[in-house]
Amino acid sequence: MSRSAPLLLNPISAISGTVNVPGSKSLSNRALLLAAVANGETHLTNLLDSEDIRHMLKALTQLGVNYRLSDDKTECWVQGLGRGFSVDNLETLFLGNAGTAMRPLCAVLATSIGEFELTGEPRMEERPIGALVDSLRQAGAQITYLKNEGYPPLKMKGMALKGGNISVEGAVSSQFLTALLMAAPLFEHDSVINIVGELVSKPYIDITLNTMAQFGITVENNNYQSFTVKGNQQYQAAGDFLVEGDASSASYFLAAGAIKGGTVRVTGVGKKSIQGDIRFADVLEKMGAKITWGDDYIEVTGAPLTAVDMDMNHIPDAAMTIATTALFAEGTTSIRNIYNWRVKETDRLAAMACELRKVGAEVIEGQDYITITPPNTLIQTDIDTYDDHRVAMCFSLVALSDTPVTINDPDCTAKTFPDYFTRLKQISA
């Protein structure tokens, strides 16, 4: 894979301004898939234009879905099929490294008609999918692994799945449950999905349930221990569907304001958001920043920051931003219960620990936690980004010190936020 040229970020002396964050990746791909199988036309606005979304759109084209994109690719009119997918010949879908496309598509295709292969980039072949496949097999799915047991690529023969009692592992990724929930209304009979172990990233399940409701399907949530879904249902087009701004993407700008002492307002997300990652602002507040909430914005004003010791299982993506914010906080910051960092775009616990040490931090990397003690002065270094958009964006915050930083392969942010560095520059002095 070709890499983009390294980007040198010189020290930023001041931060202030307003940023409208692009649409949420989680919401964009969920809404596209449900719009595709719904009855009628859905008009999506503020859709994210990024690699992960393009992989989903290309797959939907291969699966016979008609849609129209606006010139700036942030509006999409999807003509729903009114049913699961149906293909005559084997369709091979390449999904890059998009977990939000791979997992839900796997579940919906298992209960569609035809033969499908799901493939992706080399890293996708290291991201587990076994827990989802096991659950789908309980419902009657025919899925085989083409390389390694428990990992993509996969081949499946779609068929009518019966539903019934299904158990799913909750501890590795909430995307397995999300995928099952989205597919379950298409099963022949009612389903009771039982969670085995602790369910991680519960707020992402709330996003799924909220999105399903906008497409006419309600799910009985039994305190996140089990979920009851009626079978043989049809999704209904949502009409106009506004994709909220991405709360994980907002975290970098909010952190920048907190660190540098200016005032930064992020629009597109606010107190009415359905995304759990807005709770990132609460962590900044606990560290000492001043937070103001509006319906459609979050505003932060910086102040001297102090370290925190917190369970951040509920905000796994935004918690990464706390790891670099910790470089500017007094004391030792501990981020706990984040095992699922290890099964994301890269092993994020190992990657963050390695790069934080390069800038001079004292780091302890546990199996499911990380502690960070900042140095007196950050060290100028080149940050490796591991083809992980969030690593690149997190370490851009180093430039808020008196130390320049070089970000290797900065274009990896294209996965969720192609013009991130341009937006950061717009609020920097």
Curated annotation (Swiss-Prot):
Pathway: Metabolic intermediate biosynthesis; chorismate biosynthesis; chorismate from D-erythrose 4-phosphate and phosphoenolpyruvate: step 6/7. Its EC number is 2.5.1.19. It is found in: Cytoplasm. GO terms for molecular function: 3-phosphoshikimate 1-carboxyvinyltransferase activity. Its main location: cytoplasm. The keyword Transferase applies. 3-phosphoshikimate binds at residues 25-26, 30, 173-175, 201, 317, 340, 344. Belongs to the EPSP synthase family. This is 3-phosphoshikimate 1-carboxyvinyltransferase. It comes from Pseudoalteromonas atlantica (strain T6c / ATCC BAA-1087).
